[in-house]
C-alpha cells in the first residue's frame, strides 16, 4: 500500500511539473499600431539611377502570405516580388499574413502606407518587457502567432496613383513613373517593425511616446539618451522629435562604416513620416541604403532592403542596452500584500518613472 501511494504521488508530481501540464495562460498586452506613409519626392527632384542587382538566397527565411483583396491583377507580380525579397531577409518560423488594400488616400502625394496592425508587450520571448513589438517581430520572438485572427502587416496602395506606377519587376522603371515593387519593399519594412510609435502635437509643440517600440529604444538624442527615456508627454520630447536623432544599435553602426545612422527628423514635424525613416539628405543617394528614406523619386528602383535596414532590424530583435538614468525611482504604485501566518508576499506596479530612471530589477 505504501509503495502504491508513493507511486501515485510520484506520478502526480511528474505530471504537475511537466512543462505541458496545467500551464498558466500567458499574459501580454497589445494595442493598435499606426500607419506610416511613403511619399513621392518633390517635383523636380533629380535622381541618377544606379543599377542594383537583385539578390537571392537559396532558402527563404520566412513564409509570407498575401491577401490581395480588390488589388488589380496587374499589380500582383510586383507585390509578390517584393514579398519574396523580404522573405529572404526577415527570419521567422511563424507565417506572416499581409493584407493589401487598394484604396484612395488623403493625398495623391502618398504612394502607400503601412502598419504592423498591432504592437505587443510582455509576451514570453520578448527581449525587453517595457518595449512594444510589431506583430510580425513579436511572433518571431515568441515562436507563435500571438493574434491569429488578424494580419501582421497591412499595406494601403493609393489607388489614385494608378497611372503613375511602374508594374514591372525588371527594374527598368522609366523616369516618369514610380516603381511599385520598390514601394512595397519599403512598406513591408515598416510593417515588419521599422517604425517609431512617437507622436507630436503641433499646436503645443509637445511629443508623446507612451508605448515605445524597439526602434524608439535605439533612436538616440545628441546627449546619449534613448528617445524612449524622454519624459512623455512633454515639450522636451517634442523638441527631440524635431531635432537630430541617430541610431545607436551596434549592427546598424557597423554596417554604416562605424557611423551612427541619422534618422529623418525635419524641424517641421511630418505626420506619418518623421522619425520612422532614415534621413533623406543622408541616404537618398545611397546605392543600397535608400530604401527606408521617406520619399521615392521618379524612376528610383531598389530590389533589396539593403544591408543597413537588415542590420537595424537585427538590432531590434535583441534587448537594447540600458539608457542613461534620469532621476531616482519614485515609490511603487498599487502596493498590496498577501499576509500569511509566517510570511507576507508583496505585489506592486513599477514606479511611474521606472523607464526613465532605468529600473530593471527589484531585490
Question: How would you name each of these model-derived features?
Answer:
Residues 8-16:
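Bacterial N-terminal signal peptides
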